[in-house]
Amino acid sequence: MITVRAPATSANLGSGFDVFGAALERPADILRIEKANRTTIRVTGVGSKYIPEDPEKNTVGAVAEALDAPAHIEIDKGVRPASGLGSSAASAAAAAVGLNELYDRGLSREELVPIAAEGEAVVSGAAHADNVAPSIMGGFTVAREDGVTQVDASIPLVACLPEIVVSTRDARGVVPEAAPMEAVVDVVGNAATLAVGMARDDPALVGRGMEDSIVTPERAELINGYETVRSAAENAGATGVTISGAGPTVIAACHRGDRTAIASAMLDAFSEAGVEARAYKTEIGRGAELF
């Protein structure tokens, strides 16, 4: 048997729609995997009752099929489904890394990314790598069709998860089909700023680079209290605030000493909007780990 821990992730980060992603130190999924004649899955943990154990309907089953690596896989969910924190990606990433090791497939971490992305497509409907890439490789990632660029970073973050469900499919439904050139230019500049900030480990630059005027405003309408929470986080010291992935998690970049105040402010703001929430004081960290 092999045990794998794969982290939650934050995709998009505002200006990097479908391209940027970051691994979070917490929360995480833990998978226990052992060889078998056919793939079977057991799911426990956060939101497990909403996750199918049928291998044909579960991300890890698709990964096992792609690697020709049948196994009994126990998934302990630490990342809530429909949270905007890459829940299905964490399981797919852990399965890819664990099965690659267990069956001695010899694939690199980067080579595992498209396999895990195909697995995640079972849930999200499309093979996007912006979550699986950082969950496998760690740090900050830029996922393109021709490969992944990865940068180690340790930017402090607060991820505030409200008790609201926003599915990836619903969130994609509000994405504009086109945008004014002025907005596109602004977002390109912000994305470049964020990438430089990651390379420099500079929370101020990362926060500035999170600004987005195309996708985020549309998705914000799906999150009750978003603008109030964003303002509260900024007033408490956040350098930037945006929606994590498809939402509803709201993520704030900050300096390390401000995380507690920001987390408290975001929780209070959601509470004022009548929404219960949980805050993770975290940071950009490692990818999937074998035990």
Curated annotation (Swiss-Prot):
It holds the Pfam family GHMP_kinases_N. Its EC number is 2.7.1.39. Keywords: Amino-acid biosynthesis, ATP-binding, Cytoplasm, Kinase, Nucleotide-binding, Threonine biosynthesis, Transferase. It catalyses: L-homoserine + ATP = O-phospho-L-homoserine + ADP + H(+). It is an enzyme of class 2 (transferase). One of its GO terms (cellular component) is cytoplasm. Its main location: cytoplasm. Pathway: Amino-acid biosynthesis; L-threonine biosynthesis; L-threonine from L-aspartate: step 4/5. One of its GO terms (molecular function) is homoserine kinase activity. It comes from the Archaea. ATP binds at R80, P81, A82, S83, G84, L85, G86, S87, S88, A89, A90. One of its GO terms (biological process) is threonine biosynthetic process. It is found in: Cytoplasm. Belongs to the GHMP kinase family. Homoserine kinase subfamily. Catalyzes the ATP-dependent phosphorylation of L-homoserine to L-homoserine phosphate. NCBIfam families: PRK01212.1-4 (NF002288), thrB (TIGR00191). This is Homoserine kinase. It comes from Natronomonas pharaonis (strain ATCC 35678 / DSM 2160 / CIP 103997 / JCM 8858 / NBRC 14720 / NCIMB 2260 / Gabara).
